[in-house]
């Protein structure tokens, strides 16, 4: 996932 699109790190 992207750094700004990670619901759980």
From Swiss-Prot:
Matches recorded under Pfam families: Hormone_4
Keywords per UniProt: Amidation, Disulfide bond, Hormone, Neuropeptide, Secreted
Report whether Amino-acid biosynthesis shows up as a keyword of the record. Answer: no
Q: In which compartments does the protein localize?
A: Secreted
Q: List the disulfide bonds.
A: 1-6, 1-6
Recorded GO molecular functions are: neurohypophyseal hormone activity
Residues where Glycine amide is found: 9
Q: Which GO terms describe its cellular component?
A: extracellular region
Highest taxon of the lineage: Eukaryota
Any single biological process term in GO: neuropeptide signaling pathway
First-listed, main subcellular location of the protein, grouped into a coarse class: secreted
Q: What does this protein do?
A: Diuretic hormone.
User: Subunit comment for this entry?
Assistant: Monomer (F1) and homodimer (F2); disulfide-linked.
Query: Which protein family is named in the record?
Result: Belongs to the vasopressin/oxytocin family.
What protein does this entry describe?
Locupressin
Organism, by scientific name, is Locusta migratoria (Migratory locust)
